């Protein structure tokens, strides 16, 4: 059975209440946030607030597939956030394709695929993204990139492959929607690859469970939370928003 976790809609409610009560947490840069500590929910929608950016999601996926640790290799214009966190050489840690496919990180995808192929009931089907040296690697050569995803565990139950995502930190607006798209891609690929190895398996993608140490919304996106609280709509263009958090 899947734990009786919260849904995305319930996460919206908790964040809406935090904003209404002005329960702010100030981050290291002095920016106000609202935050859920120890968030755990079923990722049953592809975004929480805002709207999907399919064009960027596809560009990021292509970069992940390349396994490049350099932001210049992101197709199209390099997003400002990646430029800001990169080292003086334009290098980062958080190419998630590198994290699961590179031999330099012990081929996490292949290890997980082999484990689940040999033992479908295993609790060892896990892809480890981060590493102990991240404590030092995150600020190498002027970098500011402490990988947000720790591990993703895959559990096969009742012919469904469920993903349990474990993160130290996740931005609700930009972070979640892009990370969800990536995790959905990897889950679907894992299902396909396991079925290709033995057509009698007939596995299907199950639930994605999202566990986050700090799930947060930055003040620049408070207007989205407020708009949802008042209307039930998850997105509005900022210039059209008329509330307190303009």
UniProtKB/Swiss-Prot annotation:
Protein name (database record): Deoxycytidylate 5-hydroxymethyltransferase
Superkingdom, taxonomy of origin: Viruses
Residues of the active site: 148
Keyword hit for Transferase: yes
EC numbers: 2.1.2.8
Molecular-function GO term, any one: deoxycytidylate 5-hydroxymethyltransferase activity
Species the sequence originates in: Enterobacteria phage T6 (Bacteriophage T6)
Pfam families cross-referenced by the UniProt entry: Thymidylat_synt
Gene name of the encoded protein: 42
InterPro entries: Deoxycytidylate_hydroxyMease, Thymidate_synth/dCMP_Mease_dom, Thymidate_synth/dCMP_Mease_sf
Record-stated family: Belongs to the thymidylate synthase family.
Enzyme class: transferase
Keyword Ion transport appears in the UniProt entry: no
Catalysed reactions, semicolon-separated: dCMP + (6R)-5,10-methylene-5,6,7,8-tetrahydrofolate + H2O = 5-hydroxymethyl-dCMP + (6S)-5,6,7,8-tetrahydrofolate
Transmembrane parts of this sequence: none
Keyword line: Transferase
